[in-house]
Design a protein with these regions (language model features):
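N-terminal polybasic phosphate/anion-binding patch
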Residues: 7-76, 89, 143, 150, ...
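Ordered, amphipathic secondary-structure segments that act as subunit-interaction surfaces
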Residues: 76-82
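Anionic-ligand binding region
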Residues: 103-104, 117-121, 125, 132
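GST superfamily/GST-like fold recognition
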Residues: 7-10, 100, 110, 132-200
């Protein structure tokens, strides 16, 4: 399952910082429904940084409410969201294989941004950070794109690719945060955790 692999990768990034964590997922107890598509919908004229920060804030709001409904003890809650942008065009998760092929075709041969917002709440204190990286894709043939999409790897990933997977073969250059491109920028996350008193 692609979503489980993503959660595992992000969990491994937190463990890299020495942070022990538990997942606070929707519907684990059947006590709520959340419309992820509605949360991740792009608003008219929304710039990529504003979009990813807004979505991360909404995810954090939902997680804080979820913890309260379940009567869980107060602890820091961390959320992140990643989007890919070419100019002002936002590339979220592809709807299907054909959509993934279109996205990759547009990104091929260009430099794009990967924006990951992180938000942390502990009690009434809420802190946020934004990581912006730049990734250059090589030119890709339609056959290369189709073969990559056929692996299933692009589905469920912003911009229809995972840098930690086979797409690394298409990336001659990047600048910024490798962990941020994966979905959780470790430097920014550590800064937020330190700001609320966690020694990382």
């Amino acid at each position: 399952d692609e979503l489980e692999l993503l959660r595992l990768a992000l969990g491994q990034l937190l463990e890299q910082l020495g942070v022990h964590h538990k997942l606070l997922l929707p519907n684990a107890h059947g006590d709520e429904t959340e419309d992820a598509e509605a949360i991740e919908a792009v608003l008219a004229s929304e710039a990529p940084p504003a979009y990813v920060e807004r979505v991360t804030g909404l995810k954090l709001d939902a997680a804080v409410a979820r913890r309260a409904r379940r009567g869980l003890p107060d602890a820091p809650i961390l959320c992140s969201d990643t989007t890919v942008a070419l100019g002002r065009t936002i590339y979220g998760k592809p709807d299907d294989a054909a959509h993934a092929e279109r996205m990759l075709g547009e990104l091929a041969g260009h430099k794009h941004r990967v924006l990951t917002a992180v938000a942390l709440q502990w009690g009434s204190k809420r802190l946020t950070a934004l990581s912006v990286s730049r990734v250059t894709f090589s030119k890709l043939t339609p056959e290369q794109i189709a073969a990559y999409v056929a692996t299933g790897e692009p589905l469920g990933k912003a911009g229809a690719y995972g840098i930690q997977g086979r797409a690394a073969a298409f990336i001659p250059q990047l600048s910024g945060s490798y962990s941020g491109i994966m979905g959780l920028p470790l430097y920014e996350t550590a800064q937020l955790l330190r700001a609320v008193g966690f020694g990382v």
